[in-house]
Amino acid sequence: MKQLSSAQVRQMWLDFWATKGHSVEPSVSLVPVNDPTLLWINSGVATLKKYFDGTIIPENPRITNAQKAIRTNDIENVGKTARHHTMFEMLGNFSIGDYFRDEAITWAYELLTSPEWFDFPAEKLYMTYYPDDKDSYNRWIEVGVDPSHLIPIEDNFWEIGAGPSGPDTEIFFDRGEAFDPENIGLRLLAEDIENDRYIEIWNIVLSQFNADPAVPRSEYKELPHKNIDTGAGLERLVAVIQGAKTNFETDLFMPIIREVEKLSGKVYDQDGDNMSFKVIADHIRSLSFAIGDGALPGNEGRGYVLRRLLRRASMHGQKLGINEPFLYKLVPTVGKIMESYYPEVLEKRDFIEKIVKSEEESFARTLHSGQHFAQGIVADLKEKGQSVIAGQDVFKLYDTYGFPVELTEEIAEEAGMTVDREGFEAAMKEQQERARASAVKGGSMGMQNETLQNITVESVFNYNTSQLSSKLVAIVADNAEVGAVSEGTASLIFAETSFYAEMGGQVADYGQILDESGKIVATVTNVQKAPNGQALHTVEVLAPLALNQEYTLAIDSNRRHRVMKNHTATHLLHAALHNILGNHATQAGSLNEVEFLRFDFTHFQAVTAEELRAIEQQVNEKIWEALEVKTVETDIDTAKEMGAMALFGEKYGKEVRVVTIGDYSIELCGGTHVDNTSEIGLFKIVKEEGIGSGTRRILAVTGKEAFEAYREQEDALKAIAATLKAPQVKEVPHKVEGLQEQLRQLQKENAELKEKAAAAAAGDIFKDVKEVNGHRYIASQVSVSDAGALRTFADNWKQKDYSDLLVLVAAIGDKVNVLVASKTKDLHAGNLVKELAPIIDGRGGGKPDMAMAGGSNQPKIQELLDAVAGKL
């Protein structure tokens, strides 16, 4: 077996499959583009779904890739086991309707065992297969595998809902008896027992059926085009090749671990307790790549995942004695390890470090708050004479403040207490069940459409005309190819078309189909790309249409031009965002409609009013400069040399279209654009908002819509000016300031009157002093308009020696408000209000000297007042 670095293993994989006619598909962003079913790219095949379900036919049906992926459904096991990771690389080879079982198995065996390639000892390899899949069993024997190394497994069948499915065959590497202390042997494989001896290194999925949840598996129909989908974990392959005990002792992780040793002064013990080193090494990889791809820490979705990873890694740093931000210092090491195939981490190093360090500092503050919360729990339990921290409280410390249960146990131990581990585990299980139920999962790939896949006629899009004559080369009605259609809805393909098919964020053209006499025979209501790349026109048929006849295709030119203005404005906006916010503000999605444009981009905070103004100003300046818009078709490498911006998630062919706007913007784009920015006329941002952690959205309008937006604002201002009796609109701010000053004065006078009224009322209330067990107290219902007045009562009470304790209750609206104030240490206002609040179906809390509660049961107010004496 060859000794190879991780970079060499990855490259050897790609090189081997290239010799078998595969195209190398670049690794794409971890943040899915145009796929709402996925939280993260979680496998090598996730980016190829469009090929497997037949939505798009690839240029080359043979594909290979090395794809970064994230899975976070098992975070708690990372660091505890030898092979669990949150971020990993999947090596894959794929056949989209081309080769199948025989070639996939033969080539897999060649790559693994050939001296030219990985050169694994054949006797170390074992394969599992689906019991009914005799063809795979026989093929493994034909390539030279000993039958005793072939293990039937009932679970070796891959399917997720409706869509492509089929048996799979897995390849395992036997690391020997040293990793099988109980000498269980092949039962470990046959019974799927978790073990460190037989390491799964590759799974080959033979996608040959269209799964249908409504019927038994035996009744699944064969796919019109069978596929191969494989996945080999790079980390596992490298561990086997480098003879590492775990994935962490490879060149993918050890440089990070060595840096952690330097920062902590601790030494990584391969056979000892090294969990913290593993957690940090794994999590900083995920953080570096995900942030580099535009995801940012937050409170939901991807952001919550990243925040949880960072906090977990940070806590493990503290276990190693690192008590200051340190994770950001590991980013360069991650970048250097992966630089040969993933240069983006080093390219975005400064930005990634900034985000990680900022989040570490924020967590330090949160941790401080959590410690206060924990101390409050301990103090509360001591007062009640209890010694067990409830599972729900342990879980809150874990979930809200990032406290590992072990840290809470340490706090409890110092206080002579214990924690309710079972209650904590139950709360954790509930959260995991909720997460599984609501998780965004990669659903089925969808059923293949055989009719559309079989249409291979040529169809060309003409950018340069709004009307042309073309032959009708395909008609689809009721999901079948037909020779003619006379009514209803149909899908048409022409040899040439002037209609733009929806893609790249630009909506489709609408228009009409006319016959030779000029009669309208169909209206075009949508245009989409067919699997083989043709423009598929959805039409409402008004008169008979026949195959191979010439028709005139006429788009709605006014509609197209409005869309073009918005699309070109989108490019200007993208460039302005880079200039004003920074290069990290890259496109995360766009929509160029008729009446507006929508642009999503990565940014870690709300865009300020000043920044929005500058962005809008810069876009308009470029419009008024009347910059020429040019398009050129070239190869992808030349385009990149020109400096054209390529977008994550977009699939580019060998030939690409480059759109330049003066010397201001240059992007790869297949859409339609105006010839000169002056055609846009005017640009106005109408809304900026967050749509997820680290992603912002701008809605904007151009041309007539922009003018109307300004007119609407002007009309509103004029109406306000009239209401304020301001002679001119520009005087509105001054008038508003005057009103605000009047309001402040009235509020001040009102507060003074309330204070006087409260003082007068307090004179009577404060006379009603009772005493029990040596404590003087006042408990009374008062009539006030808001809870703030209760505090005014309390402030007056504090100034004189009326009593030791004050309890005030007020019915405000349909609610009940309670205030408890104390002047002595042995009467804790916060604890007392917690005991009283349930009487009025409420709850509350606060400090030892003052606390408040709210409830809803007004008939129980007197009962609450009567209960005070019993609490003293």
From Swiss-Prot:
Keyword set includes tRNA-binding: yes
Record key words, sorted: Aminoacyl-tRNA synthetase, ATP-binding, Cytoplasm, Ligase, Metal-binding, Nucleotide-binding, Protein biosynthesis, RNA-binding, tRNA-binding, Zinc
Record Pfam families: DHHA1, tRNA-synt_2c, tRNA_SAD
InterPro entries named in the record: aa-tRNA-synth_II/BPL/LPL, Ala-tRNA-lgiase_IIc, Ala-tRNA-ligase_IIc_anticod-bd, Ala-tRNA-synth_IIc_core, Ala-tRNA-synth_IIc_N, Ala-tRNA_ligase, Ala_tRNA_ligase_euk/bac, DHHA1_dom
MF terms (GO), sorted A to Z: alanine-tRNA ligase activity; aminoacyl-tRNA deacylase activity; ATP binding; catalytic activity, acting on a protein; transferase activity; tRNA binding; zinc ion binding
Keyword Metal-binding: yes
Catalytic activity from the UniProt record: tRNA(Ala) + L-alanine + ATP = L-alanyl-tRNA(Ala) + AMP + diphosphate
Main location: cytoplasm
GO cellular component terms attached to this protein's record: cytosol
Localisation per UniProt entry: Cytoplasm
Domain notes for this protein: Consists of three domains; the N-terminal catalytic domain, the editing domain and the C-terminal C-Ala domain. The editing domain removes incorrectly charged amino acids, while the C-Ala domain, along with tRNA(Ala), serves as a bridge to cooperatively bring together the editing and aminoacylation centers thus stimulating deacylation of misacylated tRNAs.
PANTHER family, per database record: ALANINE--TRNA LIGASE, CYTOPLASMIC, ALANYL-TRNA SYNTHETASE
Similarity field: Belongs to the class-II aminoacyl-tRNA synthetase family.
Record function comment: Catalyzes the attachment of alanine to tRNA(Ala) in a two-step reaction: alanine is first activated by ATP to form Ala-AMP and then transferred to the acceptor end of tRNA(Ala). Also edits incorrectly charged Ser-tRNA(Ala) and Gly-tRNA(Ala) via its editing domain.
Protein name listed in UniProt: Alanine--tRNA ligase
High-level lineage: Bacteria, Bacillati, Bacillota, Bacilli, Lactobacillales
UniProt gene name: alaS
